[in-house]
Amino acid sequence: MNPLKVRLGALLVDQQLLKVLLNALTGSLDASKSDDESTAVYQVLSILENLVDLNPEGLFGRDSVVSARTAGPAGTASSLESDWVNILEYLAKNRLPTKRVEVDSNAQYASEILAIILQSAGGRLRKRFVEELGGVDVALRALAGYRTVPPETPEQIEYLENMFDVLCALLMEREAKEAFIAGEGVELMVLFLKGRTAARTAALKCLDFATTRYGKAAGVCVEKGLLGLLFAVFMGRSSVKGTAKGGKRRREREEAATREEEEVRCVSILSNLFAGLGAGSADVDLTQKRQRIVAKFLERDLEKLRKLVEVMVVFAGRVASEEARIGDVFEGEDEDDVKEEVLLAKMDAGLFNVQQCAIVLAELWSTENEFALRKGIVTMLHEVELTLKFLKMTLTDYADSLGDGDEEEVEGTGGDAAQRQVRRLISQLGTD
């Protein structure tokens, strides 16, 4: 972080800039009255965006105590946080449109600023937005207007993308996951998947975030008919209505990138569903829902299993290539000194995707009395010159990366539980 930018951000906050901007927005400016005032509102929003860019951690305080210098004259983190809550309230209640036709440049920009703030802020501010201002409901209502009819104008397209970003930022918090389920967020995302519009990819991302380390969401997803839609996307049987623009090559690149993103989202969601539905659970309902996932992999001569292996192999190849490349770059360096950089490079190449594929394969392997799956896994791995040992090594590295499991427990699937799940899968894979 540039120290000059950090200093400038602190000075601006010291001078109560947030309060000045909020007073301008709520007092003297009304974007609906004239073009001049509409332009002024846009400029104020631009100042907010630039302010966040100066020093996100210092301006929001993250989840730690903010220094008196950064927190303003009141000298407290809470006063700074309250200023941001007021900004969020203004954006949510006054700048977000209630109808599709009302999305203009200011509404689009307000949704962008809202997303930027929530992505940059710490969990405490996101939780307050959820609990005090109904943030999840705000996002769901904004998205609901596009559940069957796609956006038509450039402003509507960007507005929809921004509101999905808002929802995903919120879904990093447990409180938001709970509100998402209560507000029928799963049902709304299912409608987006059925609509086969460009919003489908964003809907998958939301479901991925909602099901991550939150067991309750897994059961709801199965109940609401997600599996059929999820596998249709994963297998490429549910195409999105033409959205890519430009020449043929550009369209092909965009479509390939979208296709790949959707595949890895599907795998991640499946991994989350298995974790949330708990193997060996005494709950009959959870066991039955888990079995419904397994049954999907048994259909059509194990085609979904083969697809899963194919996806894993693609990313494993990229990771291996990157590992070799970066090994040459750091040749002669102490291994401990470059360990973090090597790991980051492998993650960028797709290591996490390989790990998620391995988890799903191991979950299928661990299913009782499904010998066809075990035979299929061994056979398909052998076809690509891999064995169960590769799965075990991948999962062992992943379990080690989970650390000491000090993350917040969320419905039994966070922190320690996530590591226990992976260790259980490793043990059930046995010896190669």
What residue ranges belong to the model's regions?
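Hydrophobic residues within the alpha-helices of tandem HEAT/HEAT-like
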Residues: 1, 28, 41-55, 107-121, ...
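Elongated alpha-helical scaffolds that mediate protein-protein interactions in large eukaryotic proteins
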Residues: 1-109, 119-137, 153, 170-183, ...
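Buried hydrophobic core positions in alpha-solenoid tandem helical repeats
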Residues: 17-25, 48, 84-95, 138-143, ...
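Residue-level detector of extended alpha-helical repeat arrays and alpha-solenoid scaffolds
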Residues: 34-44, 103, 107, 126, ...
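Short, highly charged low-complexity linear segments
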Residues: 55-57, 128-129, 199, 203, ...
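Amphipathic, alpha-helical segments enriched in basic
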Residues: 114, 155, 164, 205, ...
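A compositional/structural signature marking long, glycine- and acidic/polar-rich segments
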Residues: 137-250
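Alpha-solenoid helical-repeat scaffold
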Residues: 217-432
